[in-house]
Amino acid sequence: MTERSTGLVSVVMPTYNSAEFIEESIQSVQAQTYRYWELILVDDCSTDDTELIVARIADLDHRIRYHRLAVNSGAAIARTKAMELAAGQYIAFLDSDDLWRPDKLARQLEFLQRTGARIVCTAYDHIDEAGTPIGRRVHKPKKHADYNDVLLSCPIGNSSVLFDAGTLGIFVVPNIRKRNDDALWLQMLKKEKYILGMSDVLMSYRVRANSISANKWSLVRYHWTLYRDIEHLSVPRSAFHIFVWGALKTLRIK
């Protein structure tokens, strides 16, 4: 296992054409009250000004590292590459359009130390493209999410997760275009029984009109790929999980 810097949090941020939002996301990392972090951005061959924006910020903050993939490969490959480059004892995920509260890392690290957990996520709210809160909706995770919980409803916000890479190592994100975050949590839960959830709202998830996850019903075939090709579930069990997932979407539970 790679030797890791004790106490360092490696923030993993895959990005693609995020020029409109990425500076605000980076600023939410720079605003953290916990100061011992590095930010690793892996660019999946952006064609907008993402690289220029990151370079300008990184020139003034050497905790920020930028890596550009040779070919456009998808978010899963970019996230895995960022984890490979990470040097920290802890790894936290942040998408390049989401935002953290200033005390996010500090409170998660305190929670890990107090509970002995190795993977933790938090509650989060929703903002629109302008950064305005959407209604009063807050997504709160389960206190203890296990493998079956993630299969049924994935009660985990990607940009809220922090885990102990010093003991768990890093993970290869399954290479599917959508729902690769769900697939990653399932990989983690084969090494750790639970992902623990904090009820504190420490992250804002940005809802974008052109997001590949905005149309929930278009995700059905990706869920099928996840269940059958990656997790190797039986046809009846896969169909059951898709039915439950669809019912939850219809009822607006998630």
What do these predicted regions represent?
Residues 1-30:
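N-proximal low-complexity "stem/linker" segments adjacent to membrane-targeting elements
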Residues 7-10, 38, 183:
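Cell-envelope/extracellular polymer assembly enzymes that use nucleotide-activated donors
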Residues 20-23, 48-56, 99, 103:
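Acidic helix N-cap motif at the loop->helix transition within catalytic regions
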Residues 28, 35, 43-52, 71, ...:
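A conserved acidic beta->alpha catalytic loop
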Residues 69-86, 107:
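Glycine-rich, basic loop-to-helix element that forms the pyrophosphate-binding segment
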Residues 84, 136, 140-218:
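Conserved nucleotide-sugar donor-binding catalytic segment
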Residues 91:
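Short aromatic/hydrophobic "clamp" motif used to bind/position activated sugar donors
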Residues 103-134:
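Conserved donor NDP-sugar-binding/catalytic core segment of glycosyltransferases
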